[in-house]
Amino acid sequence: MQNKIVKIGNIDVANDKPFVLFGGMNVLESRDMAMQVCESYVKVTEKLGVPYVFKASFDKANRSSIHSYRGPGMEEGLKIFQELKDTFGVKIITDVHEIYQCQPVADVVDIIQLPAFLARQTDLVEAMAKTGAVINVKKPQFLSPSQMGNIVEKIEECGNDKIILCDRGTNFGYDNLIVDMLGFSVMKKASKGSPVIFDVTHSLQCRDPFGAASSGRRAQVTELARSGLAVGIAGLFLEAHPNPNQAKCDGPSALPLSALEGFVFQMKAIDDLVKSFPELDTSI
């Protein structure tokens, strides 16, 4: 199977290319924090030679509680994204939840993301595809890896083949997620070689059965990310925060920003090693 390459400016995203770090924060909390977080990622990735795309949401439209922080909204969020691009020269990925958001967001950012809970909403998928932007499809927690091929087909039928697939864990009973490492290769096959990336921090979520906010397993972020890269994938999707305990969303799963350089150093070493190996033919 030939690996497809999705180009984001001068960045090549492919399962056999050096891994791309899609990193940032869960949701835009303020302009100043976005600048701080983006600058930290840029410094680390430039120092270590890792291709980088900034990620954050302008609206967390699927929060469990109506009282939970959602973000600054599309208009203010796009202003912040544009300032980040102008200041740091970064590529940006963000998610959309409504059809009317697709084109305005695609006019500013470089990748638009299809949220996991909305991945089978055909009208939204078609509207995103018709922008011509690169699309990152989050695998729903309730969907098998092989079923991602149907979502890819919807996008391609609209004339867009710039598709990235992202695993963010699978439901394991109630209120828990696991990551099936065999699923990455299944998604590659189902999409005929599309780049597959791994959302490591969201995969660490744990639900409180009777609460509105998720808890998380931040202490295991390194071992889970190592495992994903060992399979041979196109990139990691990561959230970091200056003070995770005060984050407005998913702090228990976020990497402390102070640990970012050590984390990326380890991930690059693993990715370089894995992709230096020849592919073994195990067929009979």
From Swiss-Prot:
<keyword id="KW-0448">Lipopolysaccharide biosynthesis</keyword>
<comment type="pathway">
    <text>Carbohydrate biosynthesis; 3-deoxy-D-manno-octulosonate biosynthesis; 3-deoxy-D-manno-octulosonate from D-ribulose 5-phosphate: step 2/3.</text>
</comment>
<dbReference type="InterPro" id="IPR013785">
    <property type="entry name" value="Aldolase_TIM"/>
</dbReference>
<keyword id="KW-0963">Cytoplasm</keyword>
<dbReference type="Pfam" id="PF00793">
    <property type="entry name" value="DAHP_synth_1"/>
</dbReference>
<comment type="pathway">
    <text>Bacterial outer membrane biogenesis; lipopolysaccharide biosynthesis.</text>
</comment>
<dbReference type="InterPro" id="IPR006269">
    <property type="entry name" value="KDO8P_synthase"/>
</dbReference>
<keyword id="KW-0808">Transferase</keyword>
<dbReference type="InterPro" id="IPR006218">
    <property type="entry name" value="DAHP1/KDSA"/>
</dbReference>
<comment type="similarity">
    <text>Belongs to the KdsA family.</text>
</comment>
<dbReference type="GO" id="GO:0008676">
    <property type="term" value="F:3-deoxy-8-phosphooctulonate synthase activity"/>
</dbReference>
<dbReference type="GO" id="GO:0005737">
    <property type="term" value="C:cytoplasm"/>
</dbReference>
<dbReference type="GO" id="GO:0019294">
    <property type="term" value="P:keto-3-deoxy-D-manno-octulosonic acid biosynthetic process"/>
</dbReference>
<protein>
    <recommendedName>
        <fullName>2-dehydro-3-deoxyphosphooctonate aldolase</fullName>
        <ecNumber>2.5.1.55</ecNumber>
    </recommendedName>
</protein>
